[in-house]
């Protein structure tokens, strides 16, 4: 009987020890390790027209994002001063900002702003608050003034943080009134003249003001090494496609561009691809050459070599791709918003060119 009792006690003690071990909180390093181990699914670009495949891919991607979001929350509860937390919570808030989780995100952000904490985390919360305001505005549930108030709070409390000029730039882009937009842009350029956001705003202004003016572009073609310039293409309508091999929508639209090029190339139309691929040491040029060869792209490619910070695209305010410009036969910029409109714009410009070339009666 004593032996049985002793065995029972030992088993109970072992079970309790196991339960205690299971209940022990994880370390920050363990959580961060798990976070970094969650990888997005790899997109097979050859299947982007297969709707079932794309649906499955998006479902797997969302599952990965939500898993990282849960791990970010776990780290938040454990260590609000962890260096990785601001980026992880920012990603969490972006993923969960829509749908059933939007109220949770709003409450989390408000709590961080109210209670305070480490400066990087509070900056992330105020920046996320502007993101929510922008999304509400886009969805018709908020106003420009609501978004402006969120941006003003961020800038007033964190004037030296890079998120502040970025928020001002986004606010300017969402202003319907040209005077209001100009005022926000002027403030950004005055207060943050050397910021990355200022470079894009200058490009955005140039893009608006450049229509109807001569368009300048000269580069060494990435595949052949030949020199290409807009000046040498006068007399042709030129379609300029800002794109990258890593850009899903760009790749998805490439078959359509190839079809249009085949229809127009003998009618006085040239295409130019402006690549925002990664730097050469990160495989960007290799990826571009491989894709061009595989897809038999017949038009010149300008490899800029510096991803989003490439000088030419930044100088035109290109902060999303694909973006499509059109230059007319006289070498003047006709449109900076030609994506999805080429079949209207190009034939009209060809007709205008041909009409101008006819001798007067």
Per-range role (PLM):
Residues 77-88, 98-103, 112-128, 137-142, ...:
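Short solvent-exposed coil/turn linkers within tandem alpha-helical repeat scaffolds
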Residues 326-361:
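Thiol-/selenol-based redox modules, centered on thioredoxin-like
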Residues 234, 242-259, 276-280:
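Conserved redox-active cysteine motifs that mediate thiol-disulfide chemistry
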Residues 71-75, 103-116, 142-155, 180-190, ...:
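Alpha-helical repeat scaffolds
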Residues 23-73, 81-87:
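N-terminal leader/linker segments that initiate helical-solenoid repeat arrays
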Residues 219-238, 261-264:
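A short beta-strand-turn-helix
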Residues 173-220, 231-234, 281, 286-293, ...:
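N-proximal helix/coil linker or "cap" segments that precede and/or mark the start of modular domains
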Residues 222, 286-329:
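Short, internal strand/loop/helix patches
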